[in-house]
A protein has these predicted regions:
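Small-residue-biased structural context
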Residues: 1-142
Length: 142
């Protein structure tokens, strides 16, 4: 069973954002699966580390791209949106650090399992209006 399905999150008016969210949801589910396996079988360490690194890189690039577009098109709620991203990355970084430095895989599992609630809320209340705004601004450029 997956933690999150793409159908659970709001659809984006900007296809680029939609695709990024779908890719990220797939990665989140893979990290959860590997972390669960690792908690029972430590031979999965290399796979988990690689997938977690991929997830972190994807989320970081995703947020940077959204922030770049918001700045480019002068989105009024840029600071609030960026702060939400920064807080998510800080929590992800802390969970990852606790695992890597102290072997506490439960920190990763708890973070990953609480993420769907944040993702659903963030996409519905923050990303959706941002995508609508950006799509309109991009259409005006054509």
């Amino acid at each position: 069973m997956r933690l999150l399905y793409p159908e659970q999150v709001a659809y984006m008016d900007l296809e680029e954002m939609q695709e990024i969210h779908e890719d990220e949801i797939a990665l989140l589910n893979e990290v959860d699966k590997l972390a669960t396996q690792y908690s029972k079988d430590s031979t999965k360490l290399d796979e988990l580390e690689a997938k977690l690194d991929e997830y972190i890189a994807h989320v970081t690039e995703h947020f940077k791209n959204e922030e770049r577009l918001m700045e480019k098109y002068d989105f009024h709620a840029y600071e609030m949106h960026k702060m939400a991203h920064d807080m998510f990355l800080m929590d992800l970084g802390f969970a990852t650090k606790m695992w890597r430095e102290h072997g506490d895989i439960d920190k990763i599992i708890r973070f990953i399992r609480k993420s769907p609630e944040w993702i659903i809320m963030h996409i519905a209340s923050v990303d959706s209006p941002t995508a609508t705004y950006l799509a309109q601004k991009m259409a005006e450029e054509k």
